[in-house]
Swiss-Prot record:
Residues 144-154 are annotated as: Binding to RBR1. This is Replication-associated protein. Signal peptide: none annotated. Belongs to the geminiviridae Rep protein family. It comes from Tomato golden mosaic virus (strain Yellow vein). SUPFAM superfamilies: Origin of replication-binding domain, RBD-like. InterPro entries: CRESS_DNA_REP, Gemini_AL1_CLV, Gemini_AL1_REP, Gemini_AL1_REP_central. Pfam families: Gemini_AL1, Gemini_AL1_M. Changing residue 145 to A: 14% loss of interaction with RBR. No effect on oligomerization.
């Protein structure tokens, strides 16, 4: 009795299609694949156009569905040329590892993507070696975001259950020193700087780093708005700029600068945070970042504290309160006070 030919049927969430000698563009192919009528929603399509050694183009395609799609028509994924009478029939396979297929069709780089890649359990198969390979690939990524995406696709268990540690570790691995700020005005354009401020700057910036004291003196400058104190403070050299609050995260705070500028940070807030560490130029201390691990601060650099007069803003008014007498005595040993009565410049173009 003759045997019946085996009926074509593939039941899978992930399909791997190969179109040999297919001259269609990636864009035309994607449009036709998106238009296919299926009972299961499509979630992700990735197309790679590759040239054979003989110059003939072919396409690799990964299609991911929301659930399992049962394909019983081997011509279902055929593509049609819009300009001539030609059909392109693919080799159809169930993608056992969507991550492996995605990596494979990425190899030539000429790709087109629609939707969001869906991670599945088989994407992380292979045990320790696969995990190590994925970790190495993540370390070689060009950015934290790219590294996280690699881990999400290839080691989803670690992404799900160890995200907090991953996020913190990748922040350190891909840490970039903040770009140096370029002042719009040179320090020499400030022609009305009080002698106390000028002398403080010369005593610190006029020396090499080796000749500076272990814990240099800071300076607290109080003055009205638009007197130029911020621009002057920021024009002296490489610095950290802390405005309104303290953000000592490594993405914005650098251990490679010469001083800190603390601008419009209320004295009550600074007292609760790191008054003595910052104003006292203390070395090698830690700060706890919200939702992150403690950050090690190298320290040993002075701070220029800028404030306005009046209750709530003035450091003098704050320290003159009886309950702050011990802190006042400490601060007088670690910082100079300067009170501005006029702008630091002559031109009306500079203000802060």
């Amino acid at each position: 009795m003759p045997s019946h030919p085996k009926r074509f049927q593939i039941n899978a969430k992930n399909y791997f299609l190969t179109y040999p000698q297919c001259s269609l563009s990636k864009e035309e192919s994607l449009s036709q694949l998106q238009a296919l009528n299926t009972p299961i929603n499509k979630k992700f399509i990735k197309i790679c156009r590759e040239l054979h050694e003989d110059g003939q183009p072919h396409l690799h395609v990964l299609i991911q569905f929301e659930g399992k799609y049962c394909c019983q028509n081997q011509r279902f994924f055929d593509l049609v040329s819009p300009t001539r009478s030609a059909h392109f029939h693919p080799n159809i396979q169930r993608a056992k590892s969507s991550s492996d297929v995605k990596t494979y069709i990425d190899k030539d780089g000429d790709t087109l993507v629609w939707g969001e890649f869906q991670v599945d359990g088989r994407s992380a198969r292979g045990g320790c070696q696969t995990s190590n390979d994925a970790a190495a690939e993540a370390l070689n990524a060009s950015s934290k975001e790219e590294a996280l995406q690699i881990i999400r696709e290839k080691i989803p268990e670690k992404y799900l259950f160890q995200f907090h540690n991953l996020n913190s570790n990748l922040d350190r691995i891909f840490d970039k020193t903040p770009e140096p700020w370029l002042p719009p005005f040179h320090v020499s354009s400030f022609t009305n700087v009080p002698d106390e401020m000028r002398q403080w700057a010369e005593n610190y910036f006029g020396k090499s780093s080796a000749a500076r004291p272990e814990r240099p003196i800071s300076i607290i400058i109080e003055g009205d708005s638009r007197t130029g104190k911020t621009m002057w403070a920021r024009s002296l050299g490489p610095h950290n700029y802390l405005s309104g609050h303290l953000d000592l995260n490594s993405r914005v705070y650098s251990n490679k600068v010469e001083y800190n500028v603390i601008d419009d940070v209320t004295p009550q807030y600074l007292k609760l945070k790191h008054w003595k560490e910052l104003i006292g130029a203390q070395r090698d201390w830690q700060t706890n970042c919200k939702y992150g691990k403690p950050v090690q601060i190298k320290g040993g650099i002075p701070s220029i504290v800028l404030c306005n007069p009046g209750e709530g803003a003035s450091y003098k008014v704050f320290l003159d309160k009886e309950e702050n007498t011990p802190l006042k005595n400490w601060t007088f040993h670690n910082a100079k006070f300067v009170f501005l009565n006029s702008p630091l410049y002559q031109s009306s173009t500079q203000s802060s």
